[in-house]
């Protein structure tokens, strides 16, 4: 079956929609049968000056409070910039407040979100793989016996 979702991010930032307008659009998507809403996880949008960039986990929690059916996910959380324990806690919290509707979208990141903060963009795939290991362990409540290089 074909599913429909909306990505609530780059276009929203560029267009300068207010938080209330974003929430209204998400409520409408929920009521009209959309399957999912994804929110970008960027620190900036350099190609668009004065873009409004909000934390995806906070916005997805706000969206969860005003919707009932749509799944909610990050598009995508950066495994270099965010610590795995923070990612796990944010995803678990969103899943609980949304009553099981959270989707964790996680990737290796990109340089544009790191260079402004002097975070090196080195070995992103290796760091991402380690993040996944840690998050899986945290979900299982057994964060011991990990052999990590980058965290």
What are these regions (language model features)?
Residues 9-13, 42, 77-79, 107-111:
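Active-site beta-loop-alpha junctions enriched in small/polar residues
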Residues 32, 66-70, 134, 138-142:
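A structural motif corresponding to the C-terminal end of an alpha-helix
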Residues 3-7, 36, 69-76, 101-105:
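Structural preference for beta-strand elements that scaffold enzyme active sites
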Residues 23, 57, 81-84, 88:
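Glycine-rich phosphate-binding loop at the start of an alpha helix
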Residues 2, 83-149:
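Internal, glycine-rich beta/alpha segment that forms the wall or movable "lid"
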Residues 46-51, 77-83, 120-121:
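Glycine-rich "substrate-gating" loop/helix at the edge of Rossmann-like oxidoreductase active sites
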Residues 1-66, 149-150:
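N-terminal beta1-alpha1-beta2 module of alpha/beta enzyme domains
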Residues 30-31, 61-68, 91-101:
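Acidic (Asp/Glu)-rich catalytic clusters
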């Amino acid at each position: 079956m074909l599913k429909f979702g909306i990505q609530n991010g780059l276009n929203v930032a560029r267009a300068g929609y207010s938080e209330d307008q974003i929430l209204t659009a998400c409520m409408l998507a929920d009521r009209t049968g959309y399957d999912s809403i994804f929110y970008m996880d960027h620190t900036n949008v350099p190609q668009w000056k004065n873009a409004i960039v909000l934390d995806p986990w906070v916005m997805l929690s706000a969206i969860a409070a005003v919707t009932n059916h749509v799944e909610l996910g990050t598009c995508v959380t950066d495994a270099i910039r965010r610590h795995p324990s923070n990612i796990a806690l944010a995803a678990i919290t969103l899943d609980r407040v949304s009553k099981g509707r959270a989707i964790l979208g996680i990737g290796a990141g990109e340089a544009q979100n790191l260079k402004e903060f002097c975070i090196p963009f080195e070995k992103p795939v290796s760091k991402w793989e380690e993040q996944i290991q840690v998050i899986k362990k945290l979900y299982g409540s057994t964060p011991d016996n990990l052999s990590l290089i980058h965290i």
